[in-house]
């Protein structure tokens, strides 16, 4: 099965130019393709995963991806999908973000020791030295104003306002494609569905600049959720690929909590499981949804892909401990991950009567309530129910000397830090 057939099965093709011509080219030779990533933060998030994994899919199929980091365009700002003007970052900030994103991209693509190595590029290398006269004469003259105004990325902003800076973004991205076509023989650009206007503008620039040009564009669908909420966002904010911003446990939990209505689609979109494996999981969703086999497979595949096998094992261990209440088995680093968002309090490492600890740490509102909670068996210290009113929390209750985990009731956790 060819790469395009696989993408069709996975629902990963939104729009494409000259489908027949692209299929023939991909069957005939190893094709260079690119996708751009503007450095708007110091980490990619899961909203970037589809295009990143598309580059990986093409590389696994024998083609040569170019990961383009927008060190130049990142200083301008892409108006696509935005309702208002972006805040411009400083040159130093963009340079820092660029390096961070380049490091992350290297985790997903093979840049050496393969027959079809990926390439990393930074469009600041050619946009940074472009003078205004050359830009207007050699590139700008190829873009009619009516043509640009008709593009969705621009038209959607005309009422709210768009600066010349962001208006010119389409021309700069088009020039990226032309530059990569001329200097790297890059024949295909891929991007999100909101990039269709920019991609077709680039193809038009190539057509006007090069005789007998053969270049192609392909967009991937917008990832949606059945409940109508935005994909990739939680109450805590974006789901980042950087483990310092989103822990592997949080990352794993994001995928594990996928709705039954979305899980098969996400298995197709994001994983490298075979068609047969996905169809089998789809069957399990229909026949035994309570087992959540598809969600577990999705969580495992994605966490392993982004954070590695060891981080996946930790995430599974933390999840199991929180579900069963056996939290004493967790290490200090696992507690940091799993209890990142629970209420916590700093205390000195000294022996304390449990009743006093509950009140002083605001776990129970009063001594009377604390005594009731303990007597009724509602208080757990490191997963163990504690009903003795004179129980003293000592060194033995401090996991690695750093934490004591208090649970009140079935699921209300509190973390004591030392």
From Swiss-Prot:
List each copy of the S4 RNA-binding domain by range: 352-418
The cellular location(s) given in this protein's UniProt record come to: Cytoplasm
* GO BP: tyrosyl-tRNA aminoacylation
Query: Which cellular components does GO assign to this protein?
Result: cytosol
Q: Motif location ('KMSKS' region)?
A: 230-234
Question: Does the keyword section mention Cytoplasm?
Answer: yes
Instruction: Tell me its EC number(s), please.
Output: 6.1.1.1
Q: Provide this UniProt record's keywords sorted from A to Z.
A: Aminoacyl-tRNA synthetase, ATP-binding, Cytoplasm, Ligase, Nucleotide-binding, Protein biosynthesis, RNA-binding
- Cite the binding residues for L-tyrosine: 34, 169, 173
**Reaction(s) catalysed (UniProt annotation):** tRNA(Tyr) + L-tyrosine + ATP = L-tyrosyl-tRNA(Tyr) + AMP + diphosphate + H(+)
Residues that coordinate or bind ATP: 233
Pfam families documented for this protein: SYY_C-terminal (PF22421), tRNA-synt_1b (PF00579)
Does the record bear Cytoplasm in its keywords? yes
Which GO molecular function entries does the Swiss-Prot or TrEMBL record give? ATP binding; RNA binding; tyrosine-tRNA ligase activity
Motif 'HIGH' region in this chain: where?
39-48
Sum up the protein's function in the record's words.
Catalyzes the attachment of tyrosine to tRNA(Tyr) in a two-step reaction: tyrosine is first activated by ATP to form Tyr-AMP and then transferred to the acceptor end of tRNA(Tyr).
Q: How does it assemble?
A: Homodimer.
Q: Which family does it belong to?
A: Belongs to the class-I aminoacyl-tRNA synthetase family. TyrS type 1 subfamily.
Q: Which PANTHER family match?
A: TYROSINE--TRNA LIGASE, MITOCHONDRIAL, TYROSYL-TRNA SYNTHETASE
Q: What is this protein called?
A: Tyrosine--tRNA ligase 1
**Which organism encodes this protein?**
Bacillus anthracis
């Amino acid at each position: 099965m060819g790469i395009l057939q696989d993408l069709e099965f996975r629902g990963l093709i939104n729009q494409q130019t000259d489908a027949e011509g692209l299929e023939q080219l991909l069957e005939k030779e190893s094709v260079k393709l690119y996708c751009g990533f503007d450095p708007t933060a110091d980490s990619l998030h899961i909203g970037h995963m589809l295009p990143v994994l598309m580059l990986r899919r093409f590389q696994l199929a024998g083609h040569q991806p170019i990961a383009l980091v927008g060190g130049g365009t990142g200083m301008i700002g892409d108006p696509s999908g935005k309702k208002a003007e972006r805040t411009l970052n400083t040159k130093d900030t963009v340079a820092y973000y660029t390096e961070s994103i380049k490091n992350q991209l290297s985790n997903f693509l093979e840049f050496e020791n393969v027959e079809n190595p990926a390439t990393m590029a930074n469009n600041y290398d050619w946009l940074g030295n472009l003078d205004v006269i050359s830009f207007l004469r050699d590139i700008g003259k190829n873009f009619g104003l009516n043509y640009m105004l008709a593009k969705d990325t621009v038209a959607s902003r005309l009422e709210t306002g768009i600066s010349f800076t962001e208006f010119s973004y389409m021309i700069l991205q088009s020039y990226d494609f032309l530059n990569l076509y001329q200097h790297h023989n890059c024949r295909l650009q891929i991007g999100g569905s909101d990039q269709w206007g920019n991609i077709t503008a680039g193809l038009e620039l190539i057509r006007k600049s090069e005789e007998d040009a053969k270049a192609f564009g392909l967009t991937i669908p917008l990832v949606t959720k059945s409940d109508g909420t935005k994909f990739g966002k939680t109450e805590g904010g974006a789901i980042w690929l950087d483990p310092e911003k989103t822990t592997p446990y949080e990352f794993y939990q994001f995928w594990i909590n996928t709705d039954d209505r979305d899980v098969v689609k996400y298995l197709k979109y994001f994983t490298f499981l075979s068609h047969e494996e996905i169809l089998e999981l789809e069957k399990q969703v229909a026949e035994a949804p309570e087992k959540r086999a598809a969600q577990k497979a999705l969580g495992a595949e994605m966490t392993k892909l982004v954070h590695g096998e060891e981080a996946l094992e930790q995430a599974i261990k933390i999840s199991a401990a929180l579900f069963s209440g056996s939290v004493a088995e967790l290490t200090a680093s696992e507690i940091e991950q799993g209890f990142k968002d629970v209420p916590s309090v700093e205390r000195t490492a000294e022996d304390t009567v449990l009743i006093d600890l509950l009140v002083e740490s605001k776990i129970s509102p009063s001594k009377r309530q604390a005594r009731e909670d303990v007597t009724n068996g509602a208080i757990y210290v490191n997963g163990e129910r504690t009903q003795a009113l004179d129980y003293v929390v000592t060194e033995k209750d401090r996991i690695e000397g750093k934490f004591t985990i208090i649970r009140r009731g079935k699921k209300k956790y509190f973390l004591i830090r030392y």
